[in-house]
Amino acid sequence: MKTYAVLLALVVAFVCIAESTGYPVEDLEDDELTELEAEALLEDLLEDLELEDLDYNEEARSWASMAKKLKEYMEKLKQRAG
């Protein structure tokens, strides 16, 4: 029984110390963006980052040229087969 009293006294002492030296708790829920606000912000950022014309993008140009070459090759194969 003595050990329980000592443990209880220690717990109470730790709680009192924690409350007296507690750090200020920030209310993060008020400062955080709601999901809808965050989604709207991300959409705006994505719109700003989108490229107007992908042909000016080096990677898009290379893919476009590869697709064009593939179409030409397929047409030549059809002509030879037909």
Swiss-Prot record:
Chain's role: It has antimicrobial activity against Gram-positive bacteria (A.globiformis VKM Ac-1112 (MIC=0.7 uM), and B.subtilis VKM B-501 (MIC=2.9 uM)), Gram-negative bacteria (E.coli DH5-alpha (MIC=23 uM), E.coli MH1 (MIC=28 uM), and P.aeruginosa PAO1 (MIC>45 uM)), and yeasts (P.pastoris GS115 (MIC=23 uM), and S.cerevisiae Y190 (MIC=23 uM)). Does not have hemolytic against rabbit erythrocytes. Causes paralysis, but is not lethal when injected into insect (M.domestica) larvae.
Record remark: domains: The mature peptide (62-81) probably forms alpha-helices which disrupt target cell membranes.
Signal sequence, start to end: 1-22
Biological processes per GO annotation: defense response to bacterium; defense response to fungus; killing of cells of another organism
Tissue specificity as recorded in UniProt: Expressed by the venom gland.
Pfam families named in the record: Latarcin
Keywords: Amidation, Antibiotic, Antimicrobial, Fungicide, Secreted, Signal, Toxin
Modification Alanine amide, positions: A81
PTM (free text): Cleavage of the propeptide depends on the processing quadruplet motif (XXXR, with at least one of X being E).
InterPro entries assigned: Latarcin_precursor
Subcellular localization: Secreted
Organism: Lachesana tarabaevi (Spider)
Domain of life: Eukaryota
Motif Processing quadruplet motif, residue range(s) on this chain: 58-61
Listed GO CC annotations: extracellular region
Propeptide segments, given as residue ranges: 23-61
A GO molecular-function descriptor: toxin activity
Protein's UniProt name: M-zodatoxin-Lt3b
